């Protein structure tokens, strides 16, 4: 998504990811891939290495040892510092990157199941009221916005290799997770009621992904692989909980509490995960070295995030969905 940058000061929280841009849509999209793939810059569409599990292309599921059970477990740690003018924000994040298991089926075919984050929401902003007129009437006011949560993907892939060169594969993906976004308006003067409001989203959906790889020997020790993947777009389902309440001293008044069961499946502007097209090419010299280039394109213009409460950003931030393109090497 295309965004207009803004920032206040951040406070410490526990997040799978921390980014001011995760205030919009389903949050910050994970780069995905196993530790081996991430160490190679996130490539994998054209990777064929029997010693490592490749989750970037369903066709690569079949490129493995035909007798062994394989598993991969990864953790992700990230440290970020954001700055804009005199404002500073920093956060250390920690999350599970992936849990994957792969099994041989028959000869040159194999099966894989895995779990990994698809997107993460993690942000926290705080600012003070600057209007002298308002400060003179009601006193100090603090505005806070914070969000957290993750959307995960549970996937199962199957692939097969034909004529030792052509591999094809298919993958079923199930999305699920919870996203919380909250805002506070806190009055220092106890004669005024402070306001807390926000949205809780419980989401799920499913889609499919398809992949192909073709490997060509260039010499006894060198080969070239081309690969392609396509993930179908899908609507998200689930329910929304919009709430607002006012507090004064120890008294809390509920202003709004609305829960809709599976409401997202009944609306014409349901939030949507975009489709994704990926292509890649690699050059490999036995198991000693390899170079690879990947291109990914995803069109989010029909995601409907701008029109859905709980997905659209509020306040002065200007967010819109567009075409996302990624180059990895």
Residue ranges: model-predicted function:
Residues 8-39, 104-329:
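Outer-membrane beta-barrel porins/channels
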Residues 1-2:
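Bacterial N-terminal signal peptides
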Residues 6-119:
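N-terminal, post-signal peptide beta-strand-biased segments of exported outer-membrane/organellar beta-barrel
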């Amino acid at each position: 998504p295309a965004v207009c940058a803004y920032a206040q000061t951040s406070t410490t929280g526990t997040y799978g990811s921390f980014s001011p841009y995760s205030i919009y849509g389903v949050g910050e999209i994970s780069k995905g891939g196993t530790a081996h793939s991430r160490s190679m810059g996130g490539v994998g569409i054209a990777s064929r290495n029997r010693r490592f599990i490749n989750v970037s292309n369903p066709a690569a599921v079949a490129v493995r040892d035909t007798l062994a059970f394989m598993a991969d477990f990864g953790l992700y740690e990230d440290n970020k510092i954001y700055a804009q003018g005199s404002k500073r924000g920093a956060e250390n994040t920690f999350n599970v990157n992936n849990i994957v298991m792969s099994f041989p089926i028959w000869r040159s075919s194999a099966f894989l199941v895995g779990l990994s984050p698809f997107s993460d929401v993690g942000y926290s902003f705080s600012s003070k009221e600057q209007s002298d007129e308002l400060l003179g009437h009601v006193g100090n006011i603090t505005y806070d916005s914070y969000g957290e949560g993750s959307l995960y993907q549970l996937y199962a892939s199957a692939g097969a290799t034909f004529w030792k060169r052509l591999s094809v594969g298919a993958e079923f993906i199930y999305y699920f997770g919870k996203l919380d976004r909250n805002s506070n308006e806190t009055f220092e003067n106890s004669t005024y009621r402070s306001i807390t409001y926000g949205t809780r989203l419980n989401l799920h959906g499913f889609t499919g992904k398809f992949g192909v790889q073709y490997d060509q020997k260039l010499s006894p020790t060198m080969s070239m692989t081309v690969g392609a993947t396509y993930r179908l777009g899908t609507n998200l389902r689930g329910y929304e909980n919009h709430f607002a309440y006012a507090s004064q001293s120890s008294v809390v008044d509920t202003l709004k509490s609305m829960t809709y069961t599976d409401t997202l499946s009944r609306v014409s502007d349901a939030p949507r995960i975009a489709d994704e097209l990926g292509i890649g090419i690699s050059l490999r010299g036995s198991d000693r070295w390899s170079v690879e280039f990947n291109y990914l394109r995803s069109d989010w213009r029909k995601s409907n995030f701008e029109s859905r409460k709980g997905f659209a950003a509020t306040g002065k931030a200007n967010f819109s969905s567009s075409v996302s393109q990624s180059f990895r090497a």
